[in-house]
């Protein structure tokens, strides 16, 4: 009995001596570090962070995944591939495409336009056909195998042009929702900050603040001056911040891209009222052109015409790609005459005929 008691005392003393350095009181947090021996078992990569195309074109969003074949459980689970689109404010993800084995599902406006490239067993690249203006943005490729998953993000850029817009009512008359619809009405979408920033780098200078797709209000200045941010300030995109989308009123910056059709100035023996202009285009198998179409023709096709003409929103404009005397002598631009009385018989008309 004494031998047993002595053995117990020795064991308790040994344990107290060896565990005292690592003991953590119950009221203190403990951090446990776990390190994988061979790194991640599943890796997803995009060969390009950004890809470029245009409206009506096709594009491949690159994405590949790599598995560790020696890892426990590798190959047991089916691979699940999911593509989502990130909203401009990064607060939501919009489902685009999901694939698991033979099961595939496409969502929303992407139905019939997207599929996996399938170039190899580890290829998760997504092909998008017949691109629309709304397809612009950032996409997330997510690959899942059992409990393992990884993601990569690819940005889809569209060739196009940013233009400022305000309606007949005048400047600073659009809340966010009206601004977005105004762009859609002119064959465009509300521009993102990245698109406005690229336009500013390309020389866009506009002294009126406008809505962007993330709900912010900004304007681009390449030539600082007193009424536009101050004469002694540096060039840049001025940021008014985020405003109430229902109550606050500003202009809007729109974005449009290539079109599938013909934009042209209608040769007509007389000048036209607005209603006569609309009918003249219809008689020619076309429709009166929209503001987005005149900007796309000017910027992307180099369209040049020194004749002021009616457009669908009731404005009168003309596009100049080759500045010259009496035709925008200082710069290439789409010149804005205004929103004249629609009964004035003083202008021609720009038409647009879509290709089937």
Curated annotation (Swiss-Prot):
<dbReference type="Pfam" id="PF07686">
    <property type="entry name" value="V-set"/>
</dbReference>
<dbReference type="InterPro" id="IPR013783">
    <property type="entry name" value="Ig-like_fold"/>
</dbReference>
<dbReference type="GO" id="GO:0005540">
    <property type="term" value="F:hyaluronic acid binding"/>
</dbReference>
<dbReference type="InterPro" id="IPR013106">
    <property type="entry name" value="Ig_V-set"/>
</dbReference>
<dbReference type="InterPro" id="IPR036179">
    <property type="entry name" value="Ig-like_dom_sf"/>
</dbReference>
<dbReference type="InterPro" id="IPR050691">
    <property type="entry name" value="Hyaluronan_bind_Proteoglycan"/>
</dbReference>
<dbReference type="GO" id="GO:0045202">
    <property type="term" value="C:synapse"/>
</dbReference>
<keyword id="KW-0325">Glycoprotein</keyword>
<dbReference type="GO" id="GO:0031012">
    <property type="term" value="C:extracellular matrix"/>
</dbReference>
<keyword id="KW-0272">Extracellular matrix</keyword>
<dbReference type="GO" id="GO:0005576">
    <property type="term" value="C:extracellular region"/>
</dbReference>
<comment type="function">
    <text>Stabilizes the aggregates of proteoglycan monomers with hyaluronic acid in the extracellular cartilage matrix.</text>
</comment>
<feature type="disulfide bond">
    <location>
        <begin position="281"/>
        <end position="351"/>
    </location>
</feature>
<dbReference type="GO" id="GO:0062023">
    <property type="term" value="C:collagen-containing extracellular matrix"/>
</dbReference>
<comment type="similarity">
    <text>Belongs to the HAPLN family.</text>
</comment>
<dbReference type="InterPro" id="IPR016186">
    <property type="entry name" value="C-type_lectin-like/link_sf"/>
</dbReference>
<dbReference type="InterPro" id="IPR000538">
    <property type="entry name" value="Link_dom"/>
</dbReference>
<feature type="domain" description="Link 2">
    <location>
        <begin position="261"/>
        <end position="353"/>
    </location>
</feature>
<dbReference type="InterPro" id="IPR003599">
    <property type="entry name" value="Ig_sub"/>
</dbReference>
<feature type="propeptide">
    <location>
        <begin position="1"/>
        <end position="9"/>
    </location>
</feature>
<feature type="glycosylation site" description="N-linked (GlcNAc...) asparagine">
    <location>
        <position position="58"/>
    </location>
</feature>
<feature type="disulfide bond">
    <location>
        <begin position="306"/>
        <end position="327"/>
    </location>
</feature>
<keyword id="KW-0373">Hyaluronic acid</keyword>
<feature type="disulfide bond">
    <location>
        <begin position="63"/>
        <end position="141"/>
    </location>
</feature>
<keyword id="KW-0964">Secreted</keyword>
<feature type="domain" description="Link 1">
    <location>
        <begin position="161"/>
        <end position="256"/>
    </location>
</feature>
<dbReference type="Pfam" id="PF00193">
    <property type="entry name" value="Xlink"/>
</dbReference>
<keyword id="KW-0677">Repeat</keyword>
<keyword id="KW-1015">Disulfide bond</keyword>
<dbReference type="InterPro" id="IPR016187">
    <property type="entry name" value="CTDL_fold"/>
</dbReference>
<protein>
    <recommendedName>
        <fullName>Hyaluronan and proteoglycan link protein 1</fullName>
    </recommendedName>
</protein>
<feature type="disulfide bond">
    <location>
        <begin position="207"/>
        <end position="228"/>
    </location>
</feature>
<keyword id="KW-0393">Immunoglobulin domain</keyword>
<feature type="disulfide bond">
    <location>
        <begin position="183"/>
        <end position="254"/>
    </location>
</feature>
<dbReference type="InterPro" id="IPR007110">
    <property type="entry name" value="Ig-like_dom"/>
</dbReference>
<dbReference type="GO" id="GO:0007155">
    <property type="term" value="P:cell adhesion"/>
</dbReference>
<feature type="domain" description="Ig-like V-type">
    <location>
        <begin position="40"/>
        <end position="154"/>
    </location>
</feature>
């Amino acid at each position: 009995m004494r031998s047993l008691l002595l053995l117990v005392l020795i064991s308790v003393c040994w344990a107290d001596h060896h565990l005292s350095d690592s003991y953590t009181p119950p009221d203190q947090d403990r951090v446990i570090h776990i390190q994988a021996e061979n790194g991640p078992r599943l890796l997803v990569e995009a060969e390009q962070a950004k890809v470029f195309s245009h409206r009506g074109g096709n594009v491949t969003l690159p994405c590949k995944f790599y598995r560790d074949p020696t890892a426990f459980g590798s190959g047991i689970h089916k691979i699940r591939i999911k593509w989502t689109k990130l909203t401009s404010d990064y607060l939501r993800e919009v489902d685009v495409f999901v694939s698991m084995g033979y099961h595939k599902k496409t969502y929303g406006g992407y139905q019939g336009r997207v599929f996996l490239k399938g170039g190899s067993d580890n290829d998760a690249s997504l092909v998008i056909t017949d691109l629309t203006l709304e397809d612009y943005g950032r996409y997330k490729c997510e690959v899942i195998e059992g409990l393992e998953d990884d993601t990569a993000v690819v940005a889809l850029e569209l060739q196009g042009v940013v233009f400022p817009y305000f309606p007949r009512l005048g400047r600073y008359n659009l809340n966010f929702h009206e601004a977005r619809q105004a762009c859609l009405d002119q064959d465009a979408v509300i521009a993102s900050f990245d698109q406005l920033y690229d336009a500013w780098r390309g020389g866009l200078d506009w002294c009126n603040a406008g809505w962007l797709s993330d709900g912010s209000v900004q304007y681009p200045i390449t030539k600082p001056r007193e009424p536009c941010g101050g004469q002694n300030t540096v060039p840049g995109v001025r940021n008014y911040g985020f405003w109430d989308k229902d109550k606050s009123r500003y202009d809007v910056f729109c974005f449009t891209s290539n079109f599938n059709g013909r934009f042209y100035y209608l040769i007509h023996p007389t000048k036209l009222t607005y209603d006569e202009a609309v009918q003249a285009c219809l008689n020619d198998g076309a429709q009166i052109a929209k503001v987005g179409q005149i900007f796309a023709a000017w910027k992307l096709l180099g369209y040049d015409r020194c004749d002021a003409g009616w457009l669908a929103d009731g404005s009168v404009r003309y596009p100049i790609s080759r500045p010259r005397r009496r035709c925008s002598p200082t710069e290439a631009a789409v010149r804005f005459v205004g929103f004249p009385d629609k009964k004035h018989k003083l202008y021609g008309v720009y038409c647009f005929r879509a290709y089937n």
